C-alpha cells in the first residue's frame, strides 16, 4: 500500500474505561524519540468514565499528532479495532492498548529501522514485562523464543504480545469479511501479515503488558485458532 502522507508509523490505541491507565499509555507513546514522523490514533469505545476526557486533553496538546475517535456508541472490541485500523496512515502500525505502556523511548526507532532494512520481514516484536496487577508480580515474556520465525510457527500459537508488535500496513489489502467474527483481533492480524513475510524477535524488553481482572480484552477465550483455516495459506504452511 502506498503511503503519501510521509508518516512512518501509526500507533493504534484502543481503550474502554481505562481512566486509571490511559495517561501512562499515551505518555509512553508521545515520549518516543524518532527521526521520523508518527501519529497516535486512539479509538475510545464510548467509555463511561473519564477516559474520553483524558484522551481529549492529550489531543489538544498534540493536535497535529494525535487523532482521537471518541465514539458515541459502544462498538465492541473487534469493530473498534476495525474502524480505528482503517484510519491509520503510516507505513507501519504499532499497537499500544490503553492499559499497557512502553518503557523504551527508542522502541519505535529500533523496530522501524529493522523493517526498513529487512524488506522480507512483515513484522517485528520484542520481549515485554508481564505485570500481574492483582498479585503485584512481574515476569519476562518469550523465554527461549527463536529470533526468526514464520507463519508456520505462528499458526501453532500466538507468541506476539500486542504491545510489542510493529508490522507493515496494507500487506493484505482490506481486512477480510470474516475478520469481524473472530474472538480477538490480535492473533488474526498477525497471521494475516505473516503470509507476506517473516517475523523477527528483539530480545530487548521495551514495554509492559498489564494483566488484570478488568482488562476487557486479555485472553478472551481459549479458541485462539478460530479462523486459522481462513488465514493460513496451506501451500506455505507446514503443520505437523
Outline where the language-model segments fall.
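Cell-envelope/extracellular polymer assembly enzymes that use nucleotide-activated donors
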Residues: 7-10, 39, 188
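Glycine-rich, basic loop-to-helix element that forms the pyrophosphate-binding segment
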Residues: 71-88, 110
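Short aromatic/hydrophobic "clamp" motif used to bind/position activated sugar donors
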Residues: 93
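Conserved small/polar residues in nucleotide/adenosyl-binding loops
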Residues: 237-240
Amino acid at each position: 500500500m502506498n503511503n503519501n502522507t510521509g508518516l512512518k508509523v501509526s500507533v493504534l490505541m484502543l481503550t474502554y474505561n481505562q481512566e486509571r491507565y490511559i495517561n501512562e499509555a499515551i505518555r509512553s507513546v508521545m515520549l518516543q524519540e524518532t527521526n521520523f514522523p508518527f501519529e497516535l490514533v486512539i479509538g475510545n469505545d464510548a467509555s463511561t468514565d473519564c477516559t474520553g476526557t483524558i484522551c481529549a486533553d492529550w489531543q489538544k496538546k498534540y493536535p497535529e499528532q494525535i487523532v482521537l475517535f471518541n465514539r458515541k456508541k459502544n462498538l465492541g472490541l473487534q469493530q473498534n479495532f476495525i474502524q480505528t485500523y482503517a484510519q491509520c496512515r503510516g507505513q507501519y502500525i504499532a499497537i499500544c492498548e490503553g492499559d499497557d505502556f512502553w518503557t523504551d523511548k527508542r522502541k519505535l526507532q529500533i523496530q522501524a529501522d529493522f523493517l526498513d532494512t529487512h524488506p522480507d520481514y512483515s513484522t517485528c516484536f520484542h520481549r515485554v514485562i508481564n505485570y500481574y496487577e492483582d498479585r503485584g508480580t512481574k515476569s519476562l515474556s518469550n523465554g527461549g523464543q527463536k529470533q526468526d520465525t514464520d507463519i508456520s510457527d505462528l499458526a501453532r500459537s500466538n507468541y506476539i504480545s500486542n504491545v510489542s508488535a510493529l508490522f507493515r500496513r496494507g500487506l493484505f489489502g482490506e481486512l477480510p469479511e470474516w475478520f469481524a467474527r473472530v474472538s480477538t483481533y490480535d492473533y488474526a492480524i498477525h497471521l494475516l501479515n505473516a503470509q507476506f513475510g517473516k517475523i523477527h524477535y528483539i530480545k530487548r524488553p521495551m514495554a509492559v503488558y498489564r494483566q488484570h481482572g478488568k482488562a476487557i480484552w486479555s485472553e478472551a477465550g481459549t479458541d485462539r485458532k478460530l479462523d486459522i483455516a481462513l488465514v493460513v495459506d496451506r501451500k506455505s504452511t507446514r503443520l505437523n
